[in-house]
């Protein structure tokens, strides 16, 4: 019995190191014979503010269950954003269906200049300075997926040096 309590405490401790942000909560209604039956969908972003971030989409008949499911999926689908001094290393553009997201590095002190969806992702990732522009479709799900597509195109200094056949000092100077 006491062993189970310890493992529960460990799980609670790991939950506190993540920042959870609700991006979108949607209510849908199905009309049935007795009236309307509501269901909920939630889109959340989870990050450790050290460069690792993930997103999840959950559906349920209750708001709290939908949020819980989306957070679990977000923790399972974490990716790494290579951050350098609180910003991204270079400009990048990601696309998903009708949405396109442009991410640009910024000088320290600029802050995160972004819309709500991109801002939630970057704050969860731990970025402090960033410029962004969302183009095309403003659907929250599409913007999130376009942002993660942009993240997959980001290269840190080691990857850039390896692709050019140079050392890290040659690339960053």
From Swiss-Prot:
Pfam families for the chain: Ribosomal_S5, Ribosomal_S5_C
GO biological process: translation
Keywords on record: Ribonucleoprotein, Ribosomal protein, RNA-binding, rRNA-binding
One GO molecular-function entry: structural constituent of ribosome
Gene Ontology, cellular component aspect: small ribosomal subunit
SUPFAM superfamilies in the record: dsRNA-binding domain-like, Ribosomal protein S5 domain 2-like
Record family assignment: Belongs to the universal ribosomal protein uS5 family.
Protein name: Small ribosomal subunit protein uS5
Gene: rpsE
């Amino acid at each position: 019995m006491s062993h189970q309590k310890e493992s529960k405490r460990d799980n609670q401790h790991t939950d506190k190191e993540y920042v959870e942000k609700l991006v979108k909560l949607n209510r849908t209604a199905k009309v049935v014979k007795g009236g309307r039956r509501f269901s909920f969908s939630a889109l959340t972003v989870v990050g450790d503010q050290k460069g690792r971030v993930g997103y999840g989409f959950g559906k349920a008949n209750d708001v709290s269950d939908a949020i819980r499911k989306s957070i679990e999926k977000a923790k399972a689908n974490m990716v790494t954003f290579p951050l350098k001094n609180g910003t991204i290393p270079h400009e990048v553009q990601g696309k998903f269906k009708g949405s396109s997201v442009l991410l640009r590095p910024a000088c320290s002190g600029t802050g995160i200049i972004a819309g709500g969806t991109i801002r939630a992702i970057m704050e969860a990732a731990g970025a402090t300075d960033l410029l962004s522009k969302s183009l095309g479709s403003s659907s929250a799900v599409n913007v999130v997926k376009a942002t993660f597509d942009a993240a997959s195109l980001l290269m840190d200094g080691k990857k850039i040096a390896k692709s050019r056949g140079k050392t890290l000092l040659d690339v960053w100077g």
